[in-house]
Amino acid sequence: SETTYSLFQKGRAHLKRGMAAQATVSLEKAKARDPEKASIREALGIAYFRIARWEAAEAEFRKVLELSPVDDYAHYALGRCLEKQGRAREANGQYKLANAMRPGKADYESRIKDFS
């Protein structure tokens, strides 16, 4: 039987090869065994994002932030999920948080909009 770590590694390998749907299978199994592991939840969020399952991706990134509130990438990724769901103002708040945590990262800065 596969270890949680080997399931996680298999999921990441699928992601690297552009096989996001397959990645979700291994990563969901890993998550079932270790639901509090932020790295598993982040990889799963990325996989769901890549197959346009925005709500599922959002849920994973929210869990990552529950486990690790200062994870700048998770704030950015959550923003991307919200933006894909048409929630631009909410997304903007996440981009601002990500940018505040890691100033000068072009990906984060470029997504911030001025809604004033």
Where are these regions (language model features)?
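Alpha-helical segment of the N-proximal tetratricopeptide repeat
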Residues: 2-33
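TPR/TPR-like (Sel1-like) alpha-helical repeat modules
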Residues: 80-107, 113
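Structural signature of tandem alpha-helical TPR/SEL1-like repeats
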Residues: 17-29, 51-63, 85-97
